[in-house]
């Protein structure tokens, strides 16, 4: 949903920053924060467990912030929101989508980009460093170790 709200279903963050203790090589554990930054400066900040200031914005962008319960510090945000057209209705009945060949609201495109957010964060946590990501090439920039974690070899006898 965050990608949709931000109008970013067709892209991914260009930078992932982590603040976390060193992770076990085979599993990701706890973190203090993960910050995803998009090309336009918009950020998504995830706080882990009991860390973080409860007053930190959920979404922070160049024009303001959105906090818990959709509290905003964006000037005249309610008027700005009312100026936007209603979004196109989305079909949420999967069976109906199969029958009519309409795209499902939660489709492969936005599902892929949502999974990419999770995966890039997991890679940054495992390596415990800031990573830069190319959302078009779908690879980390100048970081072979990070790219190897995006496409890990499967255990035998499995393959694709």
Enumerate the predicted regions with their spans.
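Rossmann-like dinucleotide-binding domain that binds NAD(P)(H)
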Residues: 1-41
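C-terminal helical cap and adjacent loop that interface with cofactors, partners, or active-site loops
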Residues: 1-10, 31-33, 52-160
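Short Gly/Pro-enriched turn/cap motifs at secondary-structure boundaries
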Residues: 22-26, 49-50, 83-86
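Glycine-centered tight beta-turn/hairpin loop motif at sheet-sheet or coil-to-beta transitions
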Residues: 39-43, 63-64
């Amino acid at each position: 949903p965050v990608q949709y709200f931000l109008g970013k279903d067709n892209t991914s963050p260009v930078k992932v920053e982590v603040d976390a203790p060193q992770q076990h090589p085979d599993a990701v554990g706890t973190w203090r924060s993960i910050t995803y930054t998009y090309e336009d400066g918009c950020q998504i900040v995830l706080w882990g467990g009991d860390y973080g200031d409860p007053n930190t914005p959920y979404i922070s962008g160049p024009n303001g912030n959105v906090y818990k319960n959709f509290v905003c510090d964006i000037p005249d945000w309610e008027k700005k929101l009312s100026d936007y057209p209603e979004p196109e209705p989305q079909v949420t009945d999967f069976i109906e989508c199969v029958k009519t060949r309409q795209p499902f609201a939660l489709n492969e495109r936005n599902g892929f980009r949502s999974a990419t957010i999770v995966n890039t964060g997991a890679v940054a946590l495992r390596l415990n460093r800031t990573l830069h990501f190319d959302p078009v090439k779908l690879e980390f920039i100048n970081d072979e170790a990070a790219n190897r974690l995006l496409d890990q070899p499967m255990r035998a006898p499995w393959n694709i």
